[in-house]
Amino acid sequence: MLPRGVAGLSCCNQILEPIHPVMIGTIGKLLILISMVAGILSGLTFLRSSRLDDRVLEWKRIGRYSWGVLTVGTLASFGLLMYLNVTHAFEYAYVYENTSLALPLDYLVAASWAGQEGSFLLWIVMNSLVGVAVMKFAREYESPVMAVIALCQVFLITMIAGLQIGSIPIGASPFATLVEKFPTAPMIQAGIIPTDGQGLNDLLQNYWMVIHPPILFSGFASMIVPFAFAVTALWKRRYTEWVRPALPWSLFAVLALGVGIALGGYWAYITLNFGGYWAWDPVENSSLVPWLIGIAAVHTMIVQKRSGHSHKAALFLTILAYILVVYSTFLTRSGILGDISVHSFVDLGLYNQLLLWILTMAILGFGLFFLRMNELPKPTHEPEVLSREFMIFLGAMILTAVALVVLLGTSTPIMGRLFRDSPSTVPIAFYNKWSLPLTIIFLFLAGLGQLFWWNKMNVETVNKVLFRPIVLASISTIAVFFLTPFRLRAAEAAAFADTGGDALNQAGMFASLMDTWSQHGPYLLMLILVFVAFFALYGNGEVMWKIARGNLRLAGGAASHIGFAVMVLGIVASSGLSNPIGRNGAQIGDSRENFILALGETRVEQGYQITYSGHGVDEEGLPTYLLDFVDPNGHEFEMAPVAYESNRGQWIQNPDLKTYFDKDIFVAVSPSVMFGTQNDSGQITIARGDSSIVGDNEYIIEFVEFDLEVDEEFLGDSTEVAVGANLRLTHIASGETRQMSPVYIIRSDRSVDYVQNTLTEWDITVAFTGMNVDSGSINLAIQGVAMAPEDWLVVQAYEKPFISLVWIGFIFLSLGFALSVYRRSVDLRIAGKRTAA
């Protein structure tokens, strides 16, 4: 028996030589060890040179040369790993597990960071390049800042060192051979090299996943620089000057990390079948939290630089941002998430190393902070409430609160493991419930902050600057309420909470106030969110118009706020107003609906005429299912979503999109073969209380009632909604009756699961695949009786109104950060020239 991950080694035609002729793996391991030693030497010599004795330049020179050796070593080792991937060196475990002969060149290159060891190596390379830039631009801060960066770099390199000290393993090498990784596998011990690899995960074979990790890791790597400046400021007692050189790095870090997060969201939207771009997955959140804290830190740094306030907040948040980067790495790579997240890596035994890294960074950063806290400058007066610095500071605190809410929800797997020995996640409703009101406050402050002046404003001036944005925002919000489906959706939600939702919201019967809030509260908050988004849009738009005519590089803040406001409007439109195309499918207190379509069948759903016309193949050779659409205006188009079972036994369902400016049509399918159907199988729709004859007049199936008390063994921690269907199956000839209770489950990431029931004595299997709450009907997939066409699809189709605003908003947000990076870099260069003069 081969260990897990080594299946498929039977097709082999090469025998390992006692010593590999190329020795690439040995060279790669050696380069990593040399880089680690160089990192230690660089850190020690930079630490020594920061003492300002007569040998400063000599020690600094050694530190620079050592960092140069580290950089060359990491780049060379990364290049060797790419070479092994491209040349199909399947004797190496990393190459075997992440590549195959069928992969094109771009995916072979991307495989270099698809696995855990390779992504660590990519991060190390980014850190090395960041260090080179710091040595060039940090000036008098170079030595202490580089000492901190070197410490972090050494921790990272130990993750891929591949050493064994006694019984303690230190890291997992990307250059480990199959023999080294699976020493007990008999076929490997026989010296057999596989002729092909397991290949890259099919979900990762996407253009956006080729560029997403390098950008994300450049953000992670850049986050170390402001952290190092903050530690240096506390270490050297330079509590004020550190902000100017650190601010461009902070802005670049949140820019890169934000773009990386956005690309990941776009990948999820066009690749996964849950119909969205953010599922509040713990690993997604673990990147979001340091980004939010990083943005909050940027705002407090600006306040400190401009007004002399917020020294403590700027230092604390800057330190916290990087510690959360390390914490996100711990969540992703320690194995603590297990199967909770689709993004988590396989556990490589790095738990203790990652925990030590977090503790070291926390002790270094927060230890110095609390040690020096009483020495930090105190402002001579508190900022006026009606001032820009107060609004920016308050906005940073609200953003921090949002991040802490997400952090709390993200950390529940750790708390579950500590207190229940059972990691679990919180439902999506937790994040929405707490983040929505906080986002409303933050957006309102984002509008106020740019309109207010520094220092004090009087009430008359405030009224003057707020009048136009408030009037325009009010008009726009009223238009949204009356001219879009917003009012209809709010009414539908209230009706559901008042009728169909009684079983799900029984607590509301005991308090009329809670009843009213449960019916109208969420959409009222969403309407307020729309208002403050328009307010921030118009307020910052007015500021940007005035600034851009004079000096465009000063418009970064306004552009970022405009982008965030537009993005929020896009989120509200595409999520709150998402329109499921289909009313004969599943709607369980959720916007998710689906319907079943047989080959050649035509249905009319929400004004769309939809025909399942056949099968096809896309440009990458993947199987597609062809759906012919005629929209309500008579326009014809074809959708070709992908669905197939990968060689890893995983079903891949890539949606197809029809994109317009004002909406997207999103379609994903689950083919009948997913449910194990054969020729003696099919599907029916049946209403509560009705019965249907199935098979060749052999059985009667009756839908008795819904079952809202589903056995907990079927649920799991990620269950959002679970509904069972109590069925009575009667054998017509004998009169014998059996009970069945298949279950329909919606997970917290909006994916759907089906708990099938099988009657082994009759060899009949039933799956509950969808439902319509309004009509009380359900969809059943039945196997074991001849009853329906064998080729059918479960179709998930949605209109996503104005989802383009999400992407347009993030582009504006990123452009604003880019303008700010440019502005602060120019300011730093000018200040450096003045100092030199």
Regions found by a protein language model. Give the residues of each.
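Cysteine-centered motifs
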Residues: 11-12
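Solvent-exposed, non-transmembrane regions of integral membrane proteins
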Residues: 19-837
